[in-house]
């Protein structure tokens, strides 16, 4: 097993160095893709010759960078790719245990391995054919070659869902190791007062993120008509509700909702061009 890792940066903070350090010791190569228009990543702070750094001062999204990472693996004979978010890290010996589980699994039809990002998860068994998130997942490069590139129409939000569905359509599998945990941020959270006058914490996404969530979900519902159960429209409605009730840009969010529907209808995909 030759394992490369990739992380995609966008306006990161200094926690990125600690996060990368939580897994770089067990990978053979570390690919860092910087989508920031004004990059400030200092690879010297990690003290490793494993790092390959890419920056073109342009936000290319998630799918394009993952395709670059997979192509690098193909060209340099890496068998697997660990994909991480900039705000994700492994705890304790989790990454070493994770890799050992993969090495001990002889099923050649597993295209993607995933981990649990919910600290409250107490389940110990592995689950087959779950929709995995990219952060913390390990991709089988040979099967990724067979099903084709990540869909760059999606840009962000839904890239991982589409990839998993295409694995299923080609009779490959995913596996989720519940007992392997990562620390992972699901977005900005804020303290709120609910309509029932209770104090709570809610994830509140930006209007741009809401745009991608809606447009890409509509796109995937057409692309994969037999897998609507994988797309979790109810979760997106909840994100919209939180943005409208507790966000600071309600009017902009409403415009983003209409723009997402319009762009989907007009087949305007990829990166959102701000007017």
Language-model regions, residue ranges each:
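Short, well-formed alpha-helical segments that are part of the catalytic scaffolds
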Residues: 6-26
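Acidic donor-binding segment of Leloir-type glycosyltransferases
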Residues: 20-55
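Glycine-rich, basic loop-to-helix element that forms the pyrophosphate-binding segment
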Residues: 56-73
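Short beta-strand-to-loop acidic/aromatic patch adjacent to the donor-nucleotide binding site
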Residues: 78-87
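Conserved donor NDP-sugar-binding/catalytic core segment of glycosyltransferases
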Residues: 91-124
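Conserved nucleotide-sugar donor-binding
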Residues: 135-148
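A short, conserved alpha-helix in the catalytic core of glycosyltransferases
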Residues: 143, 153-186
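Non-catalytic, C-terminal membrane-associated alpha-helical segments of glycosyltransferases
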Residues: 222-275
């Amino acid at each position: 097993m030759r394992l490369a890792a990739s992380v995609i940066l966008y306006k990161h903070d200094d926690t990125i160095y600690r996060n990368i350090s939580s897994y770089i010791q067990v990978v053979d190569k570390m690919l860092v893709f910087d989508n920031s228009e004004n990059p400030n990543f200092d690879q010297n702070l990690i003290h490793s010759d494993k790092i390959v750094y890419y920056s073109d001062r342009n936000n290319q999204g998630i799918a394009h960078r993952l395709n670059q990472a997979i192509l690098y693996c193909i060209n340099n004979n890496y068998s697997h790719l660990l994909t991480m978010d900039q705000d994700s890290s492994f705890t304790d010996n989790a990454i070493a245990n994770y890799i050992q589980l993969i090495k001990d699994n002889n099923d050649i039809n597993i295209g993607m391995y995933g981990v649990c990002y919910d600290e409250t998860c107490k389940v110990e068994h592995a689950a087959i054919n779950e929709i995995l998130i990219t952060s913390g997942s390990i991709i089988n490069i040979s099967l990724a070659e067979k099903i084709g590139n990540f869909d760059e129409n999606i840009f962000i939000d839904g890239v991982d869902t589409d990839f998993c569905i295409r694995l299923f359509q080609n009779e490959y599998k995913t596996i989720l190791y519940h007992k392997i945990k990562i620390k992972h941020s699901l977005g900005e959270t804020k303290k709120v007062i609910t309509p029932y006058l209770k104090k709570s914490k809610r994830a509140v996404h930006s209007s741009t993120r809401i745009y991608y969530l809606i447009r890409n979900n509509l796109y995937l519902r057409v692309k994969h008509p037999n897998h609507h159960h994988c797309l979790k429209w109810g979760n997106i409605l909840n994100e919209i509700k939180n943005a409208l009730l507790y966000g600071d840009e309600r009017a902009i969010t409403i415009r983003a909702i209409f723009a997402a529907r319009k762009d989907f209808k007009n087949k305007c995909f990829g990166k959102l061009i701000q007017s």
